[in-house]
Every structure is written in C-alpha cells, then in structure tokens.
Amino acid sequence: MDKNRFFRAIPKVDTLIEQCDSAGLFDRYGREITVDCIRERTEALREFIGKSEDETEIIRRTESLLPDIASAAEKLFSPNLNPVVNATGTVLHTNLGRALISRKHAEHLMAIVSGYSNLEYDLEAGARGERYSHFEKLLCRITGAEAAMAVNNNAAAVMLTLSALCRGGEVPVSRGELVEIGGKFRVPDVMAQSGAIMVDLGTTNKTHLSDYEDAINENTAALLKVHTSNFRVVGFTESVSVAELVELGNKHGLPVIEDIGSGVLIDLSKYGLTYEPTVQESIRAGAAIVCFSGDKLLGGPQAGIIVGRRDYIKKIKKHPLTRAFRIDKFTAAALELTLQEYLSEENAIRNIPVLRMLTQPPMEIRERAEKLAAMLKNVNARVEVVDCESQVGGGSMPLERLRSSAVAIKPNGMTTAAFEEALRRAERPVICRVQEDRALMDMRTVQPGETELIAAEVAGILGVK
C-alpha cells in the first residue's frame, strides 16, 4: 500500500486554520486552543496512517479531520470526571468512586462548596474555630473515643499517627498484617515514610503474643495492629487480638495503634453479612488510637479518620503533617452529614447508600431486574433475568458474596464486547460486567432513577426488533 498518497491528502495546517475559522471554532474555543487541536489531531492522523493497513479507515479519518478537531476542542471545555451508572454489582467500586453520598444531602453540600461557610469560624465566640469541630463530637459519641480528627485518607491517617507518636522509635507489627493497600502502597512503605522503625514479627499465618513481648525493648514506641480487611488467610492460623495487645502494652507502658481499615460502625452480621470488627469494639478493648477509612463501609467521603485518647489526638493535631493532610470543606460537611445518620442505626441502614445496597433483600433486587427486563423486551437482543453474586469491593469483606439478580443481555448483530464498549461511551456511561458472553446489569448497585436511563441507552444502541 502506497501510504505517501494518504500523507499528501492531509490538509495543510493553514488550510485547516481557515476552515476552522469559517466553521466558528475560533469564536467558540479561541484561536490558540483551536490551532493546538489542529496540530494534535493531524499528528494523530499521521501516526495512524503510518501504523494502519486499513485504507477505508484511513480515508474515513482523513475526511472527518475537521469534525475531529472540533470534537477535541469541545472536549477540553467539557468535564472529564462525570457520573456513570454502576451496574457491576460491586458496591464499593474503587475505580467508580467508592461510597456514594446520600442524595438527600446534595442541597446542603452544594451550598457549602459554592458559598462561604463556618469551616474554621466559631459562630458563638466570633473567633477562629477548628474544622474538626463539625464532626468530632459525633465521632466520639458513636465510637466511644475521647477525641477525634480526620485527614484526607486512611494511609495518611496511619502515617501521621506513627510520625506524631512513634518517629524514631520501634513499632512491632505482625508479618501477616503487612498488607498492600492498593496502587502498590504498602504498610512497610507508609511506616518508613513516617519515621517509625518497623519491627516485623511472627509469620504470615501465625503470630503469638510472645512474639510481641520478645520484640519490646527500651526503643519501642507503640504496638501496631493492622486489620487485614482486603484479604484473608485461612487454615492453620493464629493472631493476637487488640485486647491482648492492650494488656501487653499496659504492662510496658506502650500505646496500641490499630488500623482497622474499612471503618465499620455497625455490626453488619445482624444483617446477614460477614462479621467485621467495629471501631467501637477496638476503643472498648483499649486501643489508644484507631484509624479507618471514611469512604468504605462507613459510607461517607474519602477521609482517614483518627479516634482515640485525647492526649494522643492532641499531639497528632499539632504535627506539621496535619496541615498537609487536612480535609477540605466538602469532606468536613459530607462526613458530618454521614455521621449524623449513625445516631440511629435504622436511619443509617436506610439513608446511607452503601449500607442500603449491602442490606437489600434479594427479592427486591429481583423485582428491579424484572422491571428492567420488561422495559427491554423489544430491543434487538436476547434479554433475561439471571441470578448472580455481587461483591462488597473497596478492599472490604473479600470473601463476601451477596445474592443478587442481573439482567443478562446478548445482543443480536453486534458482539458483546462492542455492546459493552458502546455502553461505556454513552452520554451517561453504563458500566456493567461481561460474563459468558453476555452483558450483565447487576441491579444491586443501580441507583433509583437509573433503570430508565439504562433502558434508554440499551435501546439506543441495539434498536428494536
């Protein structure tokens, strides 16, 4: 194939500038941005011609160069972070933003982020206040801790705690708890950055209380326990409880710090889920500091929450890294509103989207799946309701499988892969999972009002019979 003729067919930049100006692109996007897009898209076309052997596609792309330039310019002015429909069945989907904030709080949150607020202003005293004041009392009431604060994520919470309380000192931790928390970030790395000296002990599957006792010396600053929330070791295993560590710590005058991970504030085993230790249990057991995530099983915004003894929290608040890790006004507001729901367990289960999705009765999910299937009965595909399993996600309850129902769609005249891609590229992207060459819409994670949206997108892509 003679590719030179295709390269020669690419319009000159000056010609494209004139065409874009005539098409009104300069008026809409400005000359500088339009010219940048011209250069970017012509270079992309050259690269494609150099690699491709598909003459038809080369001609199509060359003929659509002007619309392609306009699309590239428009994309610069359009939001890239957009809402999607989560039909994967993974409740805490890390790639899709993890926990949802309740829509009932949207108006208040919009008022906070779009206007001034009393973020660090004491309205009663008429003086500077503290941003933790909006949720600290709630955290203390719910968990039983003496004091509380929050930073931007749980890795920061652990690092800040260790840096403030243990820098330069040794911190024994079980080898079986040296987890990787995602994105190749690991507990040993976080500890190293904090300035604490990690002392790993025990083995992957077994750690005894005597291992901790043997590791304690005059340089020991604290004892660390990390809840392995994103994996399980089963079989010939043994670990040391928080209560046992606290007893040992008290004997040697050492605080116990626990990274409990997912931040469970309600015993979810009452609702048919796998038991996960709660923050309250750790505080009652005597842990000096407990760190956990805000956007996992707690069901709030991304945050690293630190609760525990007043003297330790006071010291952490004064650490220089606290400002580097501090939360913004949106997080403070969303955390307060989420925690208020926990003042009543019934309200929390009903109003916090994560908890509501996790505790949905299977029959309710089935009914919603049947509703969507009925709406799709005339589309050009084979559609049926199937039983499936959802998962918690977000590194929480890794062994938990939740009974659910999905709408399985096998398109006619289109591959399932092409259909899944079309759903992803829709105006309101629909993210599903592909199983046995069918697109599955797991209704557990489909939110109110989204069923109709899915039906419209599917019909638009597949057409009707």
Which residues are covered by each model-predicted region?
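A short linear hydrophobic-aromatic micro-motif
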Residues: 80-81, 148, 292, 428-433
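Long amphipathic N-terminal alpha/beta scaffold segment
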Residues: 52-101, 107-108
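Structural motif of enzymes handling amino- and sulfur-group chemistry
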Residues: 311, 319-320, 327-378, 386-391, ...
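Conserved PLP-enzyme active-site core in the AAT-like
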Residues: 125-342, 377, 457
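Conserved C-terminal alpha-helix-loop-beta "cap" of PLP-dependent enzymes
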Residues: 362, 366-449, 453-454
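Long amphipathic alpha-helical segments
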Residues: 1-74
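Short Gly/Ser/Thr- and Asp/Glu-enriched loop/turn motifs at secondary-structure junctions
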Residues: 10-11, 29, 85-89, 298-301, ...
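Glycine-rich phosphate-binding segment of PLP-dependent enzymes
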Residues: 38, 43, 87-88, 98-124
